[in-house]
């Protein structure tokens, strides 16, 4: 066993007050237990009824009753129960309780400050584009179909946002698939159903058709969103506002709103379970939730189990992976960790210099020519109206092929008003009566660099504006962002500015120079096919090495709806998940199925693995890769399973069968190969804590039983896949390797099946930090407050006060779980035990006091109820003798990180440890460990310390501490503080008598310092 010292045992002052600096800098954990609250799963509802009745008879309350075909249980609030044993004691009284868990508080971790928040601005929400030079060929449609959005798109009334273009959602919209008739539940902070993009009403016939409020605020029948998170999710999922050009992934789907968090985005695990189960009960066909318990990373927590069971019942469930990328590997959010749950990580787009598409025509008969450009200002002004192009440079005598590289540069400091009058006085359109308005309704084409002669680029822009132009299209050899003043020298606004490449500008100018008219317009946004992992994201896999995330989708700076009717853009995995849920709705229309396993397999196998720094990004960050909605909806080759998990070295399967099915009408030949992703060390060099992963070049050896197969129409073949750990890596650092089995079909299909494995042994890895430094202790002797009720252990006023003893509300300590643990115990271990048959000496200790007790005084000289613990209350587990565990322990499936503990002396309901010497011993079961095997436990111990209670100590009356009722509390006002000090000075005037030769104030300060 590992038995290093613990971190510091710290004194909690008698008031329990938090220093101001600590309060200002403290960050509340995203999840913690709700005191005395538990979730119980019952074999039958009758068992739950009996337990609920017993709880209420004891003065407890029923929090929730869960009656579902996937989960039968209750959550209860138990009064006056201080330990996990109390809950277990209650549970043991009833047969038919399958499992129980403490309720955790949920504190939603915000994604980001809004990238852009506006009533009107649509940051890229008004775009539709086909990939340049390519048109999707739609196979025969099956299942449901709705064509309203398809008609709208073809009539150019609304365009698709960039996240739809990247994932090919727009192609499904073009085919008329919009989620019509599909019910999608949003389990979140509620929905602002008054938002114009979300229907403006609540109830039958509305976009938001039903819902319920499970939070601790508001009307239980009204799921209105007072926080805003759920409204963003709902807009990405199914919003539609033609006037603002906003469209969600499944704009004709209906929403079911289940509010489980309050206005501060806080809630509890049982509230969330209630929302999930109600969504299923109400007939949701897809469930999306973008909130949960950060970093839990276990599939066995109750919320993850409920989500997994809903999936197993046939309802796809989609959850964001989390936003704690800085925490490194193995930090997925519960319930995304549930088996079969679709876990989504967030991508951003790979930015390009020119992201918008236009077209121009020459003469009256030629086909339009596509070109790309970037609007630097006035995106909404670059509409689809076809406008004539005018070459302003030609007006100044510059031809499209002139060599202007030697042109004189104009100084940066320019008086724009004088340049118009002097340098460009003879410019076209300039006459004694002012500038002619010959460019009204035109696009002014102007070369930006190299500098043009006679009149600078910016002068020519102002010349064009003065002549009535509202659209400026600059061109140059290396087009970059062009900045133009918002107004010209005469105060006229510059409404729309864009820039394009020299090949485009020169072609237009040449045509105009030859006397042919040119017309141009913007027609949408360029489809950007590649992305990068967003900063607001997380790492998998789970502690069982289940592949999470399932998929990646755009979640960084995506168009969103805000509560109150606004629009803008925002970031986080919360905003990648609803896009995937909407895609599931579209896929269900195309394929006429909601089978979660099939939908997951399709999105994973058709996804596009992404690259960073010339390496494929680990599967632990991108799952199958970047979502491709159209390809997933129309794929004719199916794979099962959708992902291959090879576990760690000690638990490696010999091989995994990969079944490939050809559902096409003709036979297809497939070529199989390995695509290896970046291998990451779980631990940095010299560390035992998971990090963001040091990348190494070594990859696993993947063996395929067949590399070329031909499968007939409607037939299947199984290929065996085996894996060997990368060579030359340190197994103690747990190298996490991954990649994809590539399946290229002769029909043009290109599928990839993700795989993942771990070198080394998770079971053997350190769970507890064996090198925790012990901070200096303020004391090894503690005088605890008397128990509020029940027993008063030890004799009263039998021990004289010790100047070394610390008076404390509780003993506080902490330990560090560097990995998660399936089971953690925290035992109270007495160092002095005696037989219950031994004689009891009830005499006082006298001057010996607590110090003597701490040194292990002879038990014959001490009161046995104080000096030693009767062995009748001692139990043994895995070689450790204990009187019980700290409140809340043992705990199952604990997340990694710092674990804070407090002990007030209690070890059972209304039972407190006798005065004496103790250690607190924490033990954590290794991942994949056997609880019955002592070798699978790791241990840390506190230093030895001694405890007494206030009533044990004989304190002179003048020095007695105030009672609990009269003890000092933090001042609420300055007046209270002033009154306290006035009273204190009146009672202790001797402390402030000035010393000889010193000023009064100095003496008072010196006395206070002493």
Protein language model features and the residues they cover:
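Contiguous beta-strand segments within globular domains
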Residues: 649-657, 784-857, 862, 894-904
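Autoinhibitory propeptides
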Residues: 22, 49-164, 169-175, 199-204, ...
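Surface-exposed binding patches on compact interaction domains or structured appendages
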Residues: 612-613, 640-641, 664-722, 727, ...
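Catalytic-core environment of secreted peptidases
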Residues: 203, 215, 220-221, 448-451, ...
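Beta-sheet-dominated interaction scaffolds and their linkers
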Residues: 319, 532-537, 629-665, 706-708, ...
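Subtilisin-like serine protease catalytic core
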Residues: 171-212, 216-268, 282-285, 311-312, ...
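Substrate-binding/access-modulating region of protease and related hydrolase catalytic domains
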Residues: 180, 240, 257-343, 348-355, ...
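C-terminal subdomain of the subtilisin-like protease fold in secreted/lumenal serine endopeptidases
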Residues: 64-65, 161, 247, 288, ...
């Amino acid at each position: 066993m590992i038995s290093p010292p613990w971190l510091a045992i710290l004194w909690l002052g008698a008031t329990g007050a938090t220093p101001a600096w600590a309060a200002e800098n403290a960050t509340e954990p995203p999840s913690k237990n709700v005191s005395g609250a538990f979730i119980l799963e019952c074999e039958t509802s009758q068992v739950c009824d009996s337990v609920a009745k017993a709880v209420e008879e004891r003065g407890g309350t029923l929090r929730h009753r869960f009656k579902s075909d996937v989960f039968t249980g209750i959550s209860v609030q138990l009064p006056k129960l201080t330990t996990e044993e109390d809950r277990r004691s209650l549970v043991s009284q009833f047969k038919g309780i399958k499992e129980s868990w403490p309720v955790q508080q949920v504190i939603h971790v915000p994604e980001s400050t809004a990238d852009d928040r506006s009533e009107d601005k649509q940051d890229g929400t008004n775009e539709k584009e086909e990939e340049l030079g390519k048109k999707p060929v739609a196979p025969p449609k099956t299942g449901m179909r709705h064509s309203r959005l398809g008609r709208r798109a073809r009539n150019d009334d609304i365009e698709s946002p960039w996240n739809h273009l990247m994932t090919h959602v727009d192609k499904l919209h073009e085919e008329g698939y919009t989620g019509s008739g599909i019910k999608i539940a949003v389990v979140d902070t509620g929905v602002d159903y008054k938002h114009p993009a979300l229907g403006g009403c609540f109830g039958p016939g509305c976009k938001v058709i039903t819902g319920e409020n499970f939070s601790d605020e508001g009307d239980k029948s009204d799921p209105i969103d007072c926080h805003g998170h759920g409204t963003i999710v709902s807009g990405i999922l199914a919003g539609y506002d033609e006037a603002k050009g906003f469209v969600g992934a499944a704009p004709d789907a209906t929403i079911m709103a289940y509010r489980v968090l309050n206005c501060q985005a806080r809630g509890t695990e049982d509230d969330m379970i209630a929302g999930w189960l109600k969504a299923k009960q109400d007939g949701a066909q897809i469930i999306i939730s973008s909130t949960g318990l950060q970093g839990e990373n276990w599939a066995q927590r109750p919320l993850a189990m409920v989500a997994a069971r809903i999936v197993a019942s046939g309802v796809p469930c989609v959850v964001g992976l989390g936003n704690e990328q800085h925490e490194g590997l193995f930090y997925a959010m519960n319930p995304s960790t549930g088996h079969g749950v679709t876990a989504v990580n967030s991508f951003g787009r790979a930015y390009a210099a020119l992201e918008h598409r236009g077209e121009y025509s020459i003469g009256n008969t030629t086909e339009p020519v596509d070109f790309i450009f970037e609007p630097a200002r006035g995106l909404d002004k670059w509409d689809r109206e076809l406008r004539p192009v005018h070459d302003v440079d030609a007006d100044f005598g510059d031809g499209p092929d002139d060599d202007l590289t030697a042109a004189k540069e104009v100084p940066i400091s320019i008086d724009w008003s004088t340049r118009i009058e002097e340098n460009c006085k003879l410019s076209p359109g300039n006459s004694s009566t002012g500038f002619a308005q010959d460019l009204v309704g035109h696009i002014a084409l102007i070369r930006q660099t190299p500098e043009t002669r006679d009149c600078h680029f910016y002068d020519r822009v102002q010349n064009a504006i003065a002549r009535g132009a509202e659209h400026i299209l600059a061109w140059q050899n290396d087009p970059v962002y062009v900045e133009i003043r918002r107004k010209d020298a005469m105060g006229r606004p510059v409404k729309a500015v864009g820039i394009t490449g020299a090949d485009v500008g020169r072609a237009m100018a040449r045509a105009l120079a030859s006397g042919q008219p040119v017309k141009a317009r913007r027609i949408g946004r360029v489809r950007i096919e590649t992305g990068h992992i967003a900063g607001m994201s997380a790492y998998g896999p789970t502690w069982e090495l289940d592949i999470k995330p399932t998929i990646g989708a755009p979640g960084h700076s995506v168009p969103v709806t805000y509560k109150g009717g606004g629009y803008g853009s925002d970031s986080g995995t919360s905003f990648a998940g609803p896009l995937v849920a909407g895609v599931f709705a579209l896929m269900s229309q195309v394929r006429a199925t909601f089978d979660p396993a099939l939908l997951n397999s399709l999105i994973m196998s058709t996804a596009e693995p992404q690259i960073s720094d010339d390496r494929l990004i680990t599967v632990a960050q991108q799952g199958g890769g970047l979502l491709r909605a159209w390809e997933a909806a129309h794929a004719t080759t199916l794979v099962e399973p959708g992902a291959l998990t090879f576990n760690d070295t000690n638990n490696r399967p010999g091989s995994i069968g990969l079944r490939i099915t050809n559902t096409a009408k003709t036979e297809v030949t497939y070529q199989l190969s390995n695509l290896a992703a970046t291998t990451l060390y779980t631990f940095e060099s010299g560390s035992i804590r998971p990090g963001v992963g040091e990348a190494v070049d070594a990859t696993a050896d993947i063996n395929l039983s067949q590399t070329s197969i031909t499968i007939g129409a409607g037939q299947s073949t199984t290929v065996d896949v085996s894996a060997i750990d990368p060579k030359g890596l340190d197994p103690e650092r747990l190298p996490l390797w991954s990649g994809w089995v590539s399946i290229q079909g002769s029909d043009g299909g290109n599928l990839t099946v993700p795989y993942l494995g771990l070198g080394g042994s998770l079971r053997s890895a350190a769970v507890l930090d064996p090198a925790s430094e012990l901070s200096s202790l303020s004391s090894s002797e503690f005088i605890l407050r008397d128990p509020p009720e029940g027993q008063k252990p030890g004799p009263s006023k039998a021990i004289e006060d010790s100047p070394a003893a610390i008076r404390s509300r509780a003993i506080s300590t902490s330990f560090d779980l560097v990995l998660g643990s399936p089971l953690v115990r925290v035992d109270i271990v007495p160092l002095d035990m005696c037989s219950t048959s031994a004689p009891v000496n009830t005499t006082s200790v006298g001057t010996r006091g607590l110090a003597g007790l701490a040194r292990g005084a002879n038990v014959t000289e001490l009161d046995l109820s104080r000096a030693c613990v009767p062995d009748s209350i001692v139990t043994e587990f895995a070689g450790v003798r204990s009187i019980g565990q700290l409140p809340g322990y043992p705990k199952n499936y604990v997340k990694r990180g710092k674990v804070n503990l407090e002990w007030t002396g209690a070890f059972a309901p209304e039972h407190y440890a006798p005065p004496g010497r103790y250690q607190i011993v924490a033990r954590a079961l290794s991942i994949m460990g056997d609880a019955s095997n002592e070798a699978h436990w790791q241990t840390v111990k506190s230093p030895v310390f001694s405890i007494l209670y206030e009533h044990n100590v004989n304190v002179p009356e003048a020095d007695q501490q105030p009672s609990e009722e009269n003890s000092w509390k933090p001042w609420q006002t300055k007046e209270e503080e002033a009154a306290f000090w006035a009273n204190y000075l009146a009672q202790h005037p001797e402390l402030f008598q000035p010393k000889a030769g010193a000023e009064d104030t100095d003496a008072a300060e010196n006395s206070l310092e002493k």
